[in-house]
A protein has these predicted regions:
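A domain-level signal for the structural core that forms small-molecule/cofactor-binding pockets
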Residues: 2-58
Length: 58
């Protein structure tokens, strides 16, 4: 049962997240050979000021 976590900035609509979750689910089913109802997608929305790359703010 894949649990897929997506970290992103806040601001996407519920419709955008739903469409993205469906696309992720479709890929997981095709690639991982799992059932649709076994795929869980979790969105974690963190403000941009919490994101760093190589120790530097994005």
């Amino acid at each position: 049962m894949p649990l897929i976590t997506v970290s992103m900035y806040p601001g996407r609509t519920e419709k955008q997240k739903e469409e993205y979750a469906k696309a992720i689910k479709k890929s997981a089913v095709e690639i991982l050979k799992t059932k649709e109802n076994h795929v869980i997608v979790v969105f974690e929305e963190n403000p941009k000021e919490n994101w760093y790359m190589a120790g530097n703010p994005l």
